[in-house]
Amino acid sequence: MLGYSMGGRIALGLAVRHPDRVRSTVLVGSTAGYSTDAERAARRRSDAALADDLIERGLEWFVDHWMNLPLFESQERLGNHALAEARSLRLANDPDGLVASLLGSGTGMQPSFWGELDAVRGPVLLVVGDEDTRYRRLAVRLASGLALAQTEVVPEAGHAAHLENLPAVSAAVVEFLDRVDAR
């Protein structure tokens, strides 16, 4: 199973709660969630405020706001054409769906899996961009809690390493899956 960011948290949750169904996991720019109730509550408040802004200011404002978050700053290297394409794809989202995602599926709504990492049975590849300092720290923490973890730091990439350096991410994933299949 492979997941990026929020999708990675969902994939990790499945690997934790149903280890018999997950042979291996690839997490790109992901975490096991917030550790404390206070952190989750703060994130829920932040996501609710962002959902309100999306409703009041509209989808264009939201997409521009999202694309300009410091987390995605490294994507500037993709160039104007790729950024315009990404913006266009994001503008095709349903605003009501985005609001529902923020309020119902955001990190603050998801449980913490930090205390349950030992339930994961299969190997896990943690992929993180070398410029994504926050998620690099989180990958180190994740790796220490997972019995069969391997970390791949992708050069010249930030949070969305698969967008910023697809060849390196693809090579790491293929190599990992080849090793998993050989077991």
Positions of PLM-derived features:
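Short beta-strand immediately N-terminal to the catalytic nucleophile in serine-hydrolase-like folds
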Residues: 1-3, 28
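Gly/Ala-rich beta-loop-alpha elbow adjacent to hydrolase catalytic centers
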Residues: 3, 7, 11
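Flexible "cap/lid" loop of the alpha/beta hydrolase fold
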Residues: 13-17, 23-55
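Short, well-ordered alpha-helices that flank and scaffold nucleotide-derived cofactor binding pockets
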Residues: 16-20, 140-144, 171, 175
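Helix-loop "lid/cap" segments that line or gate small-molecule binding pockets
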Residues: 48-54, 65-77, 85-89, 101-108
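Glycosyltransferase donor-binding loop in the core domain
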Residues: 54, 90, 134, 158-164
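Conserved serine/cysteine hydrolase catalytic core
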Residues: 89-141
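Catalytic active-site module of serine/aspartate enzymes centered on a nucleophile-bearing elbow/loop
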Residues: 148-183
